[in-house]
Structures are given as structure tokens and as C-alpha cells.
Amino acid sequence: MIYMPHWPKPLGRRPKDFSLERMKSFLSKLGNPEKKMPPAIHIAGTNGKGSTLSFMRYIMQSAGYKVHAYTSPHLVNFNERIVVAGSHVDDNELYSLLEECRSAIADQPITLFEAATIAAFLVFSRHEADVTLIEVGMGGRLDATNVIDNPILTIITSIALDHMEYLGPTVETIAGEKAGIMKHNVPCVIASQEKSIMNTLEQYAVNKKSPLYRGGFEWNCSKQLSVIQVANTGIQQKNEWIPASCAGARMIFQSAIQSIEFPLPSLKGDHQIINAGNAIAACSILSGKYGFDIGEEDITSGLQHTYWPARLELIKEGNLISLLPKDWQLFLDGAHNNDGARVLADWVKDNFAEGIYMIFGVTRNRNVEEFLEHFKPYIKLLCAVCVKSEPKATDTGLIREGANNIGINAIECESIGDAILNHILKAPIQNVKTILICGSLFLARDFAMENN
């Protein structure tokens, strides 16, 4: 498997001309593969688009369908970005695809994401599948993936402030960019949003004549606790963390025509119930409008078997895990913006109110204090690390200083392994046995490399 492809070399900066004309020109030279792919579902949003895509992928696979999928970024291997009929693209085919792109594009400048998108569209156009799931890289309107003219469905997940230097200073302007994936007369599933965000999306939908299926209006998905209640917020059982919600909790999906209970999804956190709702809503449209045969049992199986790494992932083995006592736990999460921090902190509050150790690293454009403020009551020790796989990483000294400014005990560490072995395991803190690694998906990549 390939960590980074041989071509193109990263430009080190984003191009100034955010236009789709360059992408359209490149694709034209390659025979317009974007017009020859299996039916496409296009997914945008600030948070939750990868999880929503994964839920859909596993649900549809459970129903017997072949699914192509394109996501970004990758954690360890570049091949992770391109799933061809259920399997990661193999090294030889990926190499050939990129060589084909390079030959057609010649010496014209191209970003890594643009090249990956073109390679994905090429391979999807050459392999049979029933549906193609495509995740937007950033924004929507001018994203390289938005050369798809005729998706059968679009989805917009949770919207929040992120990448403001590119997408705009307010959630409303960002929503407008996300709405750019809406297409004329193509239905759009929208996660529950703040009122001003939903209003913006509705205005764009009117202009596009795009029928909306809105969370909180046409559908709703929420956790339902059974009569059995658990006094504490989490149970320790055989050294395995089990959330209190598993003790009798389920989720219920409701629309104008149905109200169905499902088990909680495999991905942890209440926010994943919303993402699962996005996927169920989308599947109901696929069944009702396009004739896909997706039953309740397929949804149940898909939700329970979905795997999407670094989303509140409990890591059970590896070099670093072997350092921990048996009753300790380590969770890995790619949360990197303020909204992601908020929902992650809610999960910590619900399950580990006694406190956690945090290993934290971010890229330079992130507000350290704003992110960490959500976790202030729970962090007993913060280990600041530099994100090694990201050239634009924040210096550990700045992280430590930002944490100290808001009253969090923080130290600088050379690596994740150094943080665990030389600091966390030697910290004199009673009854805290949980480590959370977060701040960047690139930090999750560093962990995967160190943990082997």
C-alpha cells in the first residue's frame, strides 16, 4: 500500500484560482470519466461527511450492492481514499491511473487532491458498481469533486466554522459554499442545522429547484433510552469500555411515513446518531425514488458493522497499546475544529467525567485555546506533540502556552510514545485511566505509524 503517491508532488499551498475550469479541462483530455461513473451521491459538510458516507457504504453493501467510494484525507495509505466496488484500489492500478493523468496533464500545475479526484473518477468509470459515494474535500461549490453534473442525490451534513480563509467568515457564507453541490431537481438530504444555516440552504435549494429532506423537519433521528437506566455514565466490563447508552438505548428514525427503531451505530458519540440519520434518510430516498431495495435489516447490519477510523476509535492493540496497563483505554479521534471539539467534549463528559489524559497536536491555522476550552474540566494532563506528518504543524511550545493560559496543566513531548511512556504512565493521578488523542487527522496518522 502507498503512503503518498509518486505524482504529483504537493504544491505546498492552495492555488489562488479556485475555479473548476482547470479540472474540467483535465477531465476532458481523459475522456470525461466523471460522466461515465455509476450513479453518484455527492456529500458535503463541515463535520460528519466521512462518517455519513461510511454508514451509507456499509448499509448498501449489506443490501448486496457494489459501492465505489472516494474520501479524504487518508490516515496511513493513500489507497484508502479510493474504494473500488468495496475494496481499496491496489498499488499497480493506482500507479497506472496517476501515470495516465500525468501524461494527459503534462506540465500544468495540479494539486494532489485534484489528481486524486481525477484518478478516482477514472477508476470508477472502468469498474462496475451500483452507486458511487463521493466526499467533498473542502467547501462544495468550487471543490474539485463538483464537476459531477448529474448526481442522483446530494447530502449536506453538519455545518460549522472551518477553513474561513477559503470559505468565508460566517456559517451562512460557508453554508452557501456547501450548497454549491445542489443540482437542478436532484433531492438533497440535510442534517439538522442552526436556523440561519438552514435558511441559507433553503434559499439555494429554491433557486436550484432541489427537493429538500431536512433533519428536524422531514425526518428526525434520536437516541431513545429504554426503561432500564444505568446510574453511572459508563460501565467497566472485562476491561472493556461499554457506554451507558448500550444498556438498553436504541435510536429511532422518524419521517412522515415511518417510525423505526434501530440499534445504536458502531461509531461512538451522540453526533454519530445524526450522521446515521443522514444515511438512513438518504437510503429511504434511494429506495422510494430510484428503486433500490434497502430493508430495515440491511440498515441495522450496516450501522452495526460500519468502520471509519479515528472517529472515537477505541484502539485495542499495537506497539503503544502494549505499554498500557490492562485496565487502561486509548481513544483516537480526528476532531480538529471548534464544533468537533464541542461534541467530543460532550462525549468525554458523559463517559469519563473523572478526567482524561489528552495527547494533542494541531495544524497552524487552529485556535488552540478555543478548542481546548471545551475540555478544561476533564483534562488532568495535556501532552503537546508536534504533528510530524503535517509541515504546517503548531509548535509544541505554543500548544503548551495556550493550554496554560486557560488553566490546563500541559507539557511538551517529543512523540506520542514519549507522552505515554515517560509522562502519562508516570503521572501521579488517581483513577484516571483513559487517554484521548485528538486535534488533527494528521495526528491520527502519526499515531497509526507509531502504533504500527
Task: Spell out what each predicted region is.
Residues Y70, P187-S192, M358-G361, K380-K388:
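Short internal beta-strands
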Residues M37-P39, V131-I134, L142-I155, I159-A160, ...:
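Nucleotide phosphate-binding/pyrophosphate-handling subdomain across enzymes
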Residues E34-K35, P39-I41, S51-S103:
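N-terminal phosphate/diphosphate-binding loop that engages ATP/GTP or pyrophosphate donors
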Residues M1-G45, T52-S54, Y58-A63, Y70:
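Short functional linear segments
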Residues E194-Y204, K209-Y213, K326-L332, N338, ...:
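C-terminal helical cap/extension that packs against the catalytic core
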Residues Q108, E128-V131, E135, P151-I257, ...:
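Acidic, Mg2+-coordinating active-site environments of NTP-dependent enzymes
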Residues S103-G140:
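Phosphate-binding/switch loop-helix module in NTP-utilizing enzymes
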Residues S440:
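Active-site-proximal loop/hinge segments that shape catalytic or ion-binding/gating pockets
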